[in-house]
């Protein structure tokens, strides 16, 4: 076993241990959070038109991408090593290029699952709010997933591990080897982190836990991004764009359900006032 293989093996074990410790620690923090429920504010509400548009958009993006991926040949999946040379990769992406590591791949998938499960903390809210929060989260995931899937379909980029001799041949057979941009795990992780942070800070503006929730959510999302690079699945620019897409959707969808957003479309009340003066009759109409 070479020095680099030993280093990768050691890193994999340590990251796996860290993943377990974070999971246990998160459980303890969640218990404390549930024990001290802060004052709740109701900033979000559903709207038939608004949610019809967002659910429809998310379903259309994700559904059409799935259909095109399975039944329409968008990409040429024939692999030619001569087409993919490390020297053609931008310098800042070369720095983080790594061969494939299955252990780190698995740990990265685990951190993604943890971030996506983070909104479970909103069980501390009144049950009457669960439908609103749940609907917003479904919209967030559908839109974020649809955007990253369509980008993957339209952008032809080999994954970093394909530039190394020991690339996984099963990935080549699956046709996933040229879907590097953007990082799907990172997109969904940051969407979950941004959603959790936005909703918690809006619903519990005076809570001392909001910084911890934001830090833990984005910290786990960032760990996912690092693991996706370390496992050889993505370049730096893949995870960067994925983080931007996920964060944008994660913040935008909850905002589009706030009273602040709805107030911009409320019509001002129309009132009329009539009065009789020595000079005659006057009528004032406010709109």
Where are these regions (language model features)?
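N-terminal transmembrane-helix/juxtamembrane module of multi-pass inner/ER membrane proteins
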Residues: 32-116, 154-169
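Membrane-helix interface linkers and caps
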Residues: 75-77, 127-130
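Hydrophobic alpha-helical transmembrane segments of multi-pass membrane proteins
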Residues: 103-107, 134, 138, 183
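Acidic/His-rich structured neighborhood in mature extracellular/periplasmic domains
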Residues: 110-114, 120, 132-141, 146
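Conserved, well-structured interaction surfaces
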Residues: 120-126
């Amino acid at each position: 076993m070479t020095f680099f293989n030993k280093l990768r093996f050691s890193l994999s074990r340590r990251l796996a241990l860290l993943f377990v410790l974070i999971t246990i620690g998160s459980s303890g923090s969640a218990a404390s959070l549930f024990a001290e429920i802060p004052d709740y504010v109701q900033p979000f509400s559903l709207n038939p038109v608004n949610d019809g548009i967002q659910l429809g958009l998310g379903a259309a993006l994700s559904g059409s991408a799935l259909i095109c991926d399975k039944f329409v040949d968008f990409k040429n999946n024939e692999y030619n090593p001569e087409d993919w040379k490390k020297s053609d990769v931008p310098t800042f992406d070369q720095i983080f290029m790594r061969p494939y590591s299955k252990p780190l791949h698995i740990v990265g998938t685990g951190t993604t699952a943890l971030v996506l499960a983070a909104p479970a903390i909103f069980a501390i809210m009144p049950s009457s709010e669960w439908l609103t929060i749940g609907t917003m989260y479904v919209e967030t995931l559908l839109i974020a997933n649809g955007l990253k899937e369509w980008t993957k379909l339209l952008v032809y980029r080999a994954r970093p591990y394909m530039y190394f001799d020991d690339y996984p041949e099963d990935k080549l057979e699956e046709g996933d080897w040229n879907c590097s941009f953007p990082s799907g795990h990172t997109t969904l992780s940051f969407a979950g982190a941004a959603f959790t942070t936005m909703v918690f800070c809006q619903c519990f503006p005076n809570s001392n836990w909001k910084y911890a929730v934001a830090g833990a959510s984005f910290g786990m999302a960032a760990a996912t991004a690092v693991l996706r690079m370390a496992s050889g699945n993505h370049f730096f620019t893949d995870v960067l764009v994925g983080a931007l897409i996920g964060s944008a959707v994660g913040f935008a969808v909850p905002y589009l359900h706030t009273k602040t957003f709805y107030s911009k479309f409320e019509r001002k009340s129309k009132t009329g006032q009539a009065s009789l003066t020595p000079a005659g009759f006057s009528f004032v109409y406010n709109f």
